[in-house]
């Protein structure tokens, strides 16, 4: 039986009928008409704190030090700002990212000069790649010492120039204006990182504070309103397509466009794929959702992109992990590419219809045109759906028991998602645990899935979960981490314990660097060079004892029959962080897989099992 032209949304209540969550607050400073303050004489440091208060900042993640210490003195008196004293500046950066990702607001981190600032660099690069709005405030040596190799001097502006949207070195007393400009740049257009570096003598000197300051950014005018002619061209291509796909990226979440996306999808009946950064932008339970594309995506999602005749790319950047070998990606497809960042249009794949603008406005205008022209009812995609349904039913996401009888990590993560449910926030590390969490947890709402997608930064999960919990204290927040990632930033659990931030950690402990080991298995003749972290049955460290030493509850699980009980036990503890060490086998692997640098046509559903697409036969090379 052929599939209908468009699949109706389920009428019955339940998981499939969950409505999208209301949009989170926009990534911008506090709304409303600003009150006027001043002018009054204050120190530069006081002007920083006053400015952050007026910008609506709620929490700062940071560590004091010599050059930034003047800021920490007036911070002591603030009744509006909460400071979270992290254990490492990288943790401050990732926590600010987690806060921003979970709330849609600008995250703030703070560090001193030199090593304090350079310790933020990894987190800065991570947030920049994933379009997370964060402002980093750093102290700098005095102006007369800059360039003299003074104690704890580092050219953080020069270092971060390639990995921030904009950075400021404040050499005269205009802290309020600079901070307001940094927040505006970070939150508008394509969200990203901004860095504000302030010399110590500027912080200690006197200045005149008044609010709101005058923002002077004559060269910064991001395009948000799409061109109507481009939208009409796009509507014509959609009406003519026979194998269209909505290729959805993280920009749909950043742009608060999930409701508009659902309206467009249901209006047209077009299948939807959501990238790693877009999980939750469209409900997993929806009949039109084919899952995640890319290196470890579903076979149906990969097949849909490869065999499509029209890619409707929304807020996505055609990343190599999605396209595979670029010159073989979706070879017959025309491309409509909508993105707020003009630099992304045509960067990796030529766009037949380029659209620069806010994705929410783009989709809304497209829906209006399609409704007016009556195009949705004329789409002839029944055969396309029949093909995709067949692929999806033949190659569903699945997993089997571990060959050594050990606890399966996929089972653990799937059960966690079922028990904690779609209202919880899931924050992943990088590698196996990240991919399994993207595959086997059902995401129904935006901003419930946080991960390091572009940089793939190990150590992201624990501090980012801490930041997410600070921003969404009512939500249940789970960090899903491997033992390799966990050992890079687990010290922030002490921060959580001291600050009263009760995150929960599902630690997938296989005793090795799992994703690297998988590549060694597949491509390096099982030569496991420097990937063993210690046997999981006799781990170093003992993660239960480590968790307890850091002020958390430590739990351990080795058997499948105990998984549900231990997860429920962790959920019942809400006065401190909880770490569950799930002891899993060393050789669990992530499938499906497209090997790096190869065509998506070479996808393997499982090791040695390569699907045959519609134009292939047995023996096709």
From Swiss-Prot:
Region (Thiamine pyrophosphate binding): 432-512
Residue sites binding Mg(2+) per the record: 483, 510
Enzyme class of the recorded protein, top EC level: transferase
CDD domains found in the cross-reference section: TPP_AHAS, TPP_PYR_POX_like
Binding-site residues for thiamine diphosphate, renumbered to this chain: 89
Cofactor note: Binds 1 Mg(2+) ion per subunit.
Biased composition (Low complexity): 1-19
Entry-linked SUPFAM superfamilies: DHS-like NAD/FAD-binding domain, Thiamin diphosphate-binding fold (THDP-binding)
Pathway assigned in UniProt: Amino-acid biosynthesis; L-isoleucine biosynthesis; L-isoleucine from 2-oxobutanoate: step 1/4; Amino-acid biosynthesis; L-valine biosynthesis; L-valine from pyruvate: step 1/4
Gene3D superfamilies the UniProt entry points to: 3.40.50.970, TPP-binding domain
Reaction it catalyzes: 2 pyruvate + H(+) = (2S)-2-acetolactate + CO2
MF terms (GO), sorted A to Z: acetolactate synthase activity; flavin adenine dinucleotide binding; magnesium ion binding; thiamine pyrophosphate binding
Enzyme Commission code: 2.2.1.6
Cofactors: Mg(2+); thiamine diphosphate
Region of interest: Disordered: 1-39
Annotated GO CC locations: acetolactate synthase complex
Residues bound to FAD: 190, 296-317, 339-358
Pfam short name (any one): TPP_enzyme_C
Keywords: Amino-acid biosynthesis, Branched-chain amino acid biosynthesis, FAD, Flavoprotein, Magnesium, Metal-binding, Thiamine pyrophosphate, Transferase
GO BP term, example: L-valine biosynthetic process
Matches recorded under NCBIfam families: acolac_lg (TIGR00118), PRK07789.1 (NF005860)
Family the UniProt entry places it in: Belongs to the TPP enzyme family.
Annotated protein name in UniProt: Acetolactate synthase
Name of the gene encoding the protein in the UniProt record: ilvB
């Amino acid at each position: 039986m052929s599939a209908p032209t468009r699949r109706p949304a389920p009428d019955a209540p339940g998981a499939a009928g969950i409505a999208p969550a209301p949009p989170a607050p926009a990534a911008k400073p506090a709304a409303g008409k600003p009150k006027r303050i001043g002018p009054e004489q204050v120190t530069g440091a006081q002007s920083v704190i006053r400015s952050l208060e007026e910008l609506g900042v709620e929490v700062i993640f940071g560590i004091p030090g010599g050059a930034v210490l003047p800021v920490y003195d007036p911070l002591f008196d603030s009744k509006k700002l909460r400071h979270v004293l992290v254990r490492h500046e990288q943790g401050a950066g990732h926590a600010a990212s987690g806060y921003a990702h979970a709330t849609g607001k600008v995250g703030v981190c703070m560090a001193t000069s030199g090593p304090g600032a350079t310790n933020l660099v990894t987190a800065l690069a991570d947030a920049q790649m994933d379009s997370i709005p964060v402002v980093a405030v750093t102290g700098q040596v005095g102006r007369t010492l800059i360039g003299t190799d003074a104690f704890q001097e580092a050219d953080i502006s020069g270092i971060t120039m390639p990995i921030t949207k904009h950075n400021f070195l404040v050499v005269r007393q205009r802290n309020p204006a600079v901070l307001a400009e940094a927040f505006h740049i970070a939150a508008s257009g394509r969200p990203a990182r901004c860095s504000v570096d302030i010399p110590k003598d500027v912080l200690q000197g006197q200045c005149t504070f008044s609010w709101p300051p005058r923002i002077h950014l004559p060269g910064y005018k991001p395009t948000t309103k799409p061109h109507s002619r481009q939208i009409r061209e796009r509507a014509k291509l959609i009406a003519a397509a026979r194998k269209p796909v909505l290729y959805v990226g993280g920009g749909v979440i950043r742009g608060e466009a999930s409701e508009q996306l659902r309206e467009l999808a249901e209006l047209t009946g077009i299948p939807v794929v959501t990238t790693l950064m877009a999980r939750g932008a469209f409900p997993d339970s929806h009949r039109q959702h084919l899952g995640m594309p890319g290196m470890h995506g579903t076979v149906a999602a990969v097949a849909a992109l490869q065999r499509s005749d029209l890619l409707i790319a929304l807020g996505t950047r055609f990343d190599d992990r999605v396209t595979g070998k670029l010159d073989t990606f979706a070879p017959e497809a025309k491309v409509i590419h909508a993105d707020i960042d003009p630099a992304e249009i045509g960067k990796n794949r030529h766009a037949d219809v380029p659209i620069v603008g806010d994705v929410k406005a783009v989709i809304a205008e497209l829906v209006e045109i399609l409704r007016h022209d009556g195009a949705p009812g004329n789409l002839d995609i029944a055969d396309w759906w029949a093909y995709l349904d067949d692929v999806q039913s033949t190659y569903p996401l699945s997993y089997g028991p571990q060959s050594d009888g050990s606890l399966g990590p996929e089972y653990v993560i799937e059960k966690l998602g079922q028990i904690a449910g779609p209202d919880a926030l899931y924050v992943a590390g990088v590698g196996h645990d990240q991919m399994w969490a993207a595959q086997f947890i059902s995401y129904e709402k935006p901003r419930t899935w946080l991960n390091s997608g572009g940089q793939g930064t190990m150590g992201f999960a624990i501090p980012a979960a801490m930041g997410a919990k600070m921003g969404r204290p009512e939500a249940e927040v789970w960090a899903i981490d491997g033992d390799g990632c966990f050992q890079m930033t687990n010290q922030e659990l002490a921060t959580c314990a001291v600050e009263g931030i009760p995150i929960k950690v599902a630690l997938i402990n296989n005793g090795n660097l799992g994703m690297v080991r998988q590549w060694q298995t597949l491509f390096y003749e099982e030569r496991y060079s420097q990937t063993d972290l210690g046997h999981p049955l006799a781990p170093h460290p003992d993660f239960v004892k480590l968790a307890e030493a850091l002020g958390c509850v430590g739990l351990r699980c080795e058997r499948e029959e105990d998984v549900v009980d231990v997860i429920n036990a962790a959920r019942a503890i809400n006065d401190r962080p909880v770490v569950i060490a799930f002891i899993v086998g060393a050789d669990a692997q992530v499938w499906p897989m497209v090997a790096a640098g190869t065509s998506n046509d070479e996808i393997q559903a499982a090791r040695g099992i390569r699907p045959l697409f519609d134009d292939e036969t047995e023996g096709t090379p």
